Amino acid sequence: MKKCRCGRSGCVCILVMKREYGMEKNLKREKEHTTEYVLQKAVCFRAGEFSKEEKYIVPEEKYDLYLNGEMIHTFFCSPWYLEDLAYGFLYLEGYILKSEQIKEICVKQQEHRIEVVADKECDMRRQDAKETGKKAEEKKISSKEIMSLAAALDERSHRFRLTGGVHSAALAKDGEILLMREDVGRHNAVEKLLGACVREQIDTADKTIVFSGRVAAEILEKAAAIGAPTLIAVSAPTSRAVELAEEKGILLVGFARGESFNVYTFPERLAEVI
């Protein structure tokens, strides 16, 4: 196995310099070091008969997150876009306020560690970003755009179609998906997406989050922490998520499938007159 710049085998080292890498180059670099799928032998029952087959399943691994030498969290996650997962977690939990505070990230795959070197002031947690999320700006959206984005998320979810085992979270604007993150865990998928936004300093005030899973309160809080005004979900929200969406000023859409969807908050923001 090739050694990374730190000289250690099995380590993916990312030196975070101000805007050194564009988004697509960062994605390509991490993908080269990750496992997309696992081929698993299985006994399958179909139409009254058994057969031995090989099935694709999604990888799930345990990674410990270290901040300036101290372990602060353990992830059970899919082993791709791990630097975005670290950014998202550190931002949401109040360790960092901006991407420049992180100086270096080393993803050590053999040791299952994500090591972050950050400013010393990041050693102490500040106020939880999920509790202080900005009030979302109002933004109109059409029913056509809602249905188009839900369909686009499904079309781009190739890992789900192959394995049935991942959640997807995407950032969109004007009916177009700008970036997407996937993970075996729905919370991880959202944290990876928001981490990418923090890392690339993306202004999300006029963007839409599109999500494949159920929207519970914590998912809503994580979306609100960045300030996206609209959250479109393929599945259902919970009662607490609807309450939080009202408080945070988020247009919450659920069951966005085919040519139907439900709007739970701020229906007046639909472009059509109701």
Model feature map: region roles:
Residues 4-6, 13, 24-174, 179-180:
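Intrinsically disordered, low-complexity regions enriched in acidic/Ser/Thr/Pro/Gln residues
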